[in-house]
């Protein structure tokens, strides 16, 4: 059996690292922003266009695929890579976060989380064991331990109890994964390679609990570590402080994944702190609402002032949308509620995010000082 | 001033012709199926993909663009080619048909048609003169005379009165066009070329009126002729009979355009009768409803029987959808109400229509007998 997963740091610049992951479906250069393909599609974007944009890894959501078309269906079809015809890397979340945020009726016990489907109200249970079974059946390259995402705000005792539960679930996740990892649909055809299971650090907004969670998760031992429980409503200064404190507690030779982040200036900021992987629905969801990220700040394309604007969306962007269409046309498509608005807006926003990450990576490799990392203008934070 | 518009018949096979139109924005091989890009977008399909599909000419709807973003807006932006970033040929309808079918409150007088916008209820008047002004401002390569599309069913006296009105409007359309054709936005930059104004034959379901309309429209004189007033609810045998009777009355050296047609087997049938141009929302609209045209008949992709089907949509199709994705995946996208379903379904249906027309053209050029024109299987007519 050859190595299923590897990660190499190739250059550093302060805390920031440029690295390279190798998964059973190819290489991923880090730091990397991973587009979200909820139900095995990045909304509105064909797979060949994702390739053209340089996407090396994308997300699928276990909760959604579990409900539709179902894990056994995907397994029968050879796993999610074959199902969605995407031969590069894929990561799945554990389903835990989605259950917390989407299900009205959920109940957490030591065993796991019982919940009702947002589609038809049917009853289901996710546990560390079932989350592993689902993620193995779906067959992404990187899968996540089943955790409890602590709500915000939460008291310290509640947060600690939640963290302890996540640690017990991490052990159970690892045990279940080790027992069944050979059941991934592409095990034989990929030279008996298996998936990589990442652990998740919780601990809410308490630095000491974050520290304890990090140390004890590392003790269990995973090929990569995620920081979970952020983007739950806390102030972004809090996130930044906790991430900065936690990163040094994680092994240098393993990838670090900050879940559910963020705005363009945030993904740059966290890459500087030594985060290697990030994902967020923001570029794709914002695109659907006509909110576009550019080198000149963000803009809301439905604004009347773009109706006669013959210029490109972003004069400094070389994506196919900026090279071909005017703001006036994009504004017209959005105002007319045309599907092409979503397709083109999403194409640009993804291009902007991926390009931002590539420039960060390049700066790290060239050893440029941190000031020369891409500057993301403040309008991102204020203007709409 | 060089020639603005030309049409050459390059080969014939029975009544069918293979020809070539040259417009100020390039060549169009006929017979041709023209995708409908209502508000300057073929719903969900980026322009580079239309180019890849081999689209040489597409439609814009004057009514829709007149209301949003407005003719003066498009003129200011250089015309619809620049506006939508499409440098190949475009045809606009006159707005007449849309007014008849979309406006609740319309009133026809000798002057024109007054109507209320379906968007905001505002009052407007379309006349031959204003329809020419709108179409010149939008700046398609081929524009249409303003006509009255006679409703179905209609009595003979009513149909004759309507036909006479259309003939008077045809004269007025031509006069207005000749007086203002140099005002097209790209007049100077395209070497003082202007648009081509086509006449429209009406006459309802009465062969004698169709004949009279054809003869008197030809007498007025246009560089191309359309058959209007079909696809209004009449039986398709009736359409076929009237088209077959009318085509021989039109000049051999001018393109013939059958408006608003049709199913795959119909576009083949009408090309055989000597029709050179057709347009229809069917391939794009059907795609949005999951109805897909294939060499094996048509299929409704949401059907449960496709949930585990790993085969391509159409094993005989070489479009990028059929080459990459399985029916199971397309079914999943449709069942999940994903935008990518519309993008991929539309891509395939357009590819199927364009490919069908290319094969018809090839058969005419090779002088194959009519039996060897592409056979479109009967399931198109029955199964869903």
Swiss-Prot record, chains A, B:
One of its GO terms (molecular function) is metal ion binding. Catalyzes the base-exchange of a guanine (G) residue with the queuine precursor 7-aminomethyl-7-deazaguanine (PreQ1) at position 34 (anticodon wobble position) in tRNAs with GU(N) anticodons (tRNA-Asp, -Asn, -His and -Tyr). Catalysis occurs through a double-displacement mechanism. The nucleophile active site attacks the C1' of nucleotide 34 to detach the guanine base from the RNA, forming a covalent enzyme-RNA intermediate. The proton acceptor active site deprotonates the incoming PreQ1, allowing a nucleophilic attack on the C1' of the ribose to form the product. Pathway: tRNA modification; tRNA-queuosine biosynthesis. This is Queuine tRNA-ribosyltransferase. Binds 1 zinc ion per subunit. The keyword tRNA processing applies. GO terms for cellular component: cytosol. Belongs to the queuine tRNA-ribosyltransferase family. Residues 260-266, 284-288 are annotated as: RNA binding. The active site is at 93 (proton acceptor), 279 (nucleophile). Its cofactor is Zn(2+). Zn(2+) binds at residues 317, 319, 322, 348. InterPro entries: ArchSynthase1/Queuine_TRR, TGT, TGT-like_sf, tRNA_ribo_trans-like. Keywords: Glycosyltransferase, Metal-binding, Queuosine biosynthesis, Transferase, tRNA processing, Zinc. Pfam families: TGT.
